[in-house]
Design a protein with these regions (language model features):
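Rossmann-fold NAD(P) dinucleotide-binding segment
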Residues: 53-65, 80-82, 210-229
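Rossmann-like dinucleotide/phosphate-binding beta-alpha-beta segment
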Residues: 135-225
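Phosphate-binding beta-alpha-beta segment of Rossmann-like dinucleotide-binding domains, i.e.
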Residues: 94-148
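An anion/phosphate-binding loop that grips the pyrophosphate of nucleotide cofactors and donors
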Residues: 44, 62, 197-198, 226
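N-terminal glycine-/charge-rich "phosphate-binding" loop or analogous flexible N-terminal tail
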Residues: 1-44
Length: 318
């Protein structure tokens, strides 16, 4: 059995991939382009990938290919019609990053809400050493307890965030982007009500026709002026140009983004024009990537392979 890992770099250089060798001969590539892919998968029985396209252009010569393991939940890189026609099984992974993403959500919130960038700079640039006062209250902050935390998309991650927000003493409300979700533990509201009532809005929804550009200049105008927006869902749910406008015009107090419409960020992104604005926090799609989450992910991929080889259907999407 020949296994090919096409994008090991996307799992992190600190991860141990030796466990895959129990399934057969393993070839590891740090990264793979579409042009490089056909030759690399030509003799593979199992391909492990993340973002590189799996389609006729990359797979047409892979006559032995039986299984594609995607190291993510989304399978947008898979040509489903092609793999079905060629009887190639596909698995994904889910649930591995719930704790990590929830943790990062609150890290980003507190970074903005407690003005940590400003106060860290205040100490390190010498202003505190030059002060005659033992403290600094230039940028007042408020307590999270008693605030309303609005969640867009109450899946596993959304529910984890909700439970943590409750532990901080927040009232939690949520908006179901599909309209089908109903959770008795939390108050469900429409989008307008969520934006009007929430001091914090965090996005944990998938990208689809209903959510693309959901947050735009019109919806920002419905938010509280002191509200903070956090997007750890999908980048294109937030219109980034409109977000910059909303921040400049004071429609909202701050925004934190871990996902962007284009990743890596484009050099001409309007967000980069606000790089020195401490009301905006951007991280490079790292919310999912705690060491524990990546270790769980690798374990799930190995479990998927073992299940497939034993005739099982663990995490099969095709």
């Amino acid at each position: 059995m020949r296994l090919v890992i096409l994008e090991a770099e996307s799992l992190g250089k600190d991860m141990d991939l030796s466990g895959f060798s129990r399934f057969g001969e393993v070839t590891v590539y740090e990264k793979t382009t579409e042009e490089e892919c056909p030759e690399r998968v030509r003799e593979a029985d199992i391909v492990i990938c993340n973002k590189v396209r799996m389609c006729s252009r990359t797979l047409s010569g892979a006559e032995n290919l039986k299984l594609i393991c995607v190291t993510a939940t989304g399978i947008n890189n898979i040509d489903l019609d092609y793999v079905k026609r060629h009887n190639i099984a596909v698995t994904n992974v889910a649930g591995y990053s719930t704790v990590s993403v929830a943790q990062h959500t609150f890290a980003m919130y507190f970074y903005l809400a407690e003005k940590l960038r400003y106060y860290d700079d205040y100490v390190k640039n010498g202003s505190y050493a030059a002060s005659s006062l033992f403290t600094c209250m230039d940028r007042p902050f408020t307590e999270l307890e008693g605030k309303t935390w609005g969640i867009i998309g109450l899946g596993a991650i959304g529910r984890k965030v909700a439970s943590i927000a409750q532990a901080f003493g927040c009232r939690v409300i949520y908006y179901s982007t599909s309209g089908a979700h109903d959770d008795p533990d939390y108050e469900r509201v429409d989008l307008y009500r969520l934006l009007k009532d929430s001091d914090v809005v965090s996005i944990h929804a998938p990208l689809n026709e209903a959510t693309e550009n959901l947050m735009n200049i019109e919806t920002f105008a419905n938010m509280k002026r002191n509200a903070i927006l956090i997007n750890v869902g999908r980048g294109s749910i937030v219109n980034e140009r409109d977000l910059c406008c909303a921040l400049r015009e004071g429609l909202i107090a701050g925004a934190a983004l871990d996902v962007l419409s284009s990743e890596p960020i484009r050099s001409d992104s309007p967000l980069l024009k606000m790089a020195d604005d401490d009301r905006l926090c951007i991280t490079p799609h790292i919310a999912w990537a705690s060491k524990e989450a990546r270790t769980r992910l690798i374990g799930l991929v190995q479990k998927n392979i073992a299940s497939y080889l034993e005739g099982g259907m663990e995490n099969r999407v095709v």
